[in-house]
Amino acid sequence: MRHLLKPLLALAPITTMAAQRPNIIYIMTDQQTATAMSCIGNTDLHTPNIDRLAAAGVTFTNAYCSSPLSGPSRASMFTGYMAHELGVERNGTPIPDSVRTRTLGTLVGEAGYECAYAGKWHAHTASIPDGEFGFRNIHNHDDAGLAEACVDFLNSHSKPQRPFFLVASFDNPHNICEFARQQDLPFADITVPDVSECPGLPANYAISPYDADIIQREKSLNYSGYPTTSYTDDDWRRYRYAYYRLVEHVDKEIGKIVDAIDKNSLWRNTVVIFTSDHGDGTGAHHWNQKSVLYDEVTNIPMIVVLPGKKNAGKKLPQLINNGPDFFASICDWTGADKPKGTRGVSYRNVAESGNANAQHQPYVVTETLFDKGAGTLGWSVRTPDFKYVLYDKGRYREQLYDMHRDRGETRNLAVEKAYAETLSQHRRMLEEWMQQYGVK
């Protein structure tokens, strides 16, 4: 009899542990900058549903993408590696076979979760192939019907037999790319009013003295990506109007998912994470789209709603990399095995503590490759007080900004003698990171 009981006793803690693990709902937009939310005081748009998540959760104000381009950023999220480690530094490059079977969906599934994916995958195919990377595809890359597919999933999982991991990945506000190219928008309709009704220009609209000159060079070499060279001030204001309407459009879709979470009483045992793969220039420094290392492009929204809405409404300043750190955090919450060689730092403990002074990590790095132009490489090192940027070519390729006094990055301190030691410290941090991550 004892030999029959042993396997049952061994399974009991696992079953209990699985029941206690939270569901995970990951809501992701494409190309949304951190300031494109009304809950942080932006009066140029209204995002009531994202605001609902912020009121219920913890907002990380210093969350950064691992790469300011969709394919590399998403590959990093779902593998736990930086894009250069994968060789996925351009859109259209597939995740290598060496890690395809150890991606996040597979690992979380092996930990006992049901994994479902709805919407844009883009790592590298537009939609996730059904059954690959550990996910069941419940809706292809199309914002129309995406929220409804997620609502149907949640309605059928109000009392799940096992925990679930649901990804809702929207395309918008990415349609701003088509807007800039004067093309039809795939997933939204926008009528731009008279310019007098459009948002004003950002405070950091002008190209700053001592800005890296390679940025404008890259812009000139990729007109299809950056068709804004001849934009007037009014054109930029229209661009900003369209961008904020696209954010509001996707906010309405997110609201359907939030309503379903309410309806099915899922808050008590669910972690809901809202974020984006990267931001958009939104006219700052005369920039649209991504790839560059301005904060409008690299600083992304990140809201974490904990089970029972613990620490609701708190804002935390800890530095987050929404590539490897997201991967590590999901492994932490689900009990999935985190592969050796992935270096992400889980933000679970910081979110659950709600302590703005809790130790997390001293800096985060974002890496970029301008994939259609001069092929410029760049890295940014964000510390609690400063941001250091290095491009591999051009004049003024080093940038240093005081992120308390100059969040708009208008005064490059790298050219000022008084900040020579701070500059050296950040150079050493980047050198340390490059050695650790094998960047030559």
Model segments located where?
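C-terminal cap/loop subdomain of S1 sulfatases and analogous C-terminal strand-loop tails that border
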Residues: 146, 157, 163, 278-284, ...
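Active-site-proximal N-terminal segment of extracellular/periplasmic enzymes that hydrolyze or transfer
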Residues: 19-58, 67, 179, 408-419
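Short, structured active-site-proximal loop/turn typified by the sulfatase FGly-forming signature C/S-X-P-X-R
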Residues: 41-74, 80-85, 110-115, 194-195, ...
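Active-site-proximal cap/lid insertion segments
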Residues: 34-35, 40, 156-162, 170-269, ...
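A short aromatic-rich beta-strand->coil structural motif
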Residues: 24-32, 108, 120, 165-168, ...
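Catalytic-site neighborhoods of secreted/periplasmic enzymes
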Residues: 76-166, 170-190, 360, 393
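Short, solvent-exposed turn/loop segments enriched in Gly/Ser/Thr/Pro and often Arg
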Residues: 39-41, 57-81, 94-95, 117-127, ...
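Long, internal low-complexity/basic segments
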Residues: 19-22, 29, 33-34, 59, ...
